[in-house]
């Protein structure tokens, strides 16, 4: 049988670990999710250079969607870039701004000042593939975080057969890539 001092030590250790977990959870809830504003702006800028057709095509082929962007303004801008591309319209800062105004999303995008800021980020689309890779990787990390949190919550509420439950979670994680 453990002595009273051993028991106190274990309780203290347990309390300490609970506090650590609690602090870790609190820290996790206030942490900023993975993203790279610089890569997002670089990729958007590359889409605006020389009509952006090659870069936009590469984005589509790489499964870059508006959801891949962390910043809401960037999502709105990329949605408009894709819409212009699908219409066969040229993509530059003036046509993009006009599209944002006509679609009622100018304010949400940050307007012409944001477009000019983004446009000034790079001078050549030469590194667009690298920017796209960074944007996509950060998006996948955010999806993994979200899926992991949802899986953790589901573990507390798990009611079904454990092997079926684990299979579902494995499938959700596998679907991220």
Regions found by a protein language model. Give the residues of each.
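Noncatalytic partner-interaction/assembly domains of nucleic-acid and motor enzyme complexes
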Residues: 2-139
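Interdomain "pre-motor" coupling segment immediately N-terminal to P-loop NTPase/helicase cores
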Residues: 120-177
């Amino acid at each position: 049988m453990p002595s009273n001092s051993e028991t106190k030590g274990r309780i203290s250790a347990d309390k300490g670990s609970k506090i650590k977990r609690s602090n870790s959870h609190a820290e996790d809830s206030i942490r900023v999710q993975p993203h790279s504003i610089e890569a997002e702006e670089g990729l958007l800028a590359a889409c605006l250079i020389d009509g952006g057709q090659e870069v936009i095509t590469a984005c589509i082929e790489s499964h870059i969607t508006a959801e891949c962007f962390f910043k809401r303004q960037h999502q709105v801008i990329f949605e408009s870039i894709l819409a212009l591309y699908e219409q066969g319209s040229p993509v530059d800062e003036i046509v993009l701004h006009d599209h944002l105004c006509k679609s009622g999303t100018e304010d949400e995008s940050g307007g012409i000042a944001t477009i000019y800021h983004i446009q000034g980020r790079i001078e050549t689309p030469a590194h667009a593939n690298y920017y796209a890779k960074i944007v996509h990787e950060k998006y996948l990390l955010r999806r993994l975080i979200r899926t992991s949190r949802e899986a953790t919550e589901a573990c507390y509420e798990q009611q079904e057969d454990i092997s079926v439950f684990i299979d579902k979670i494995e499938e959700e994680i596998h679907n991220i890539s």
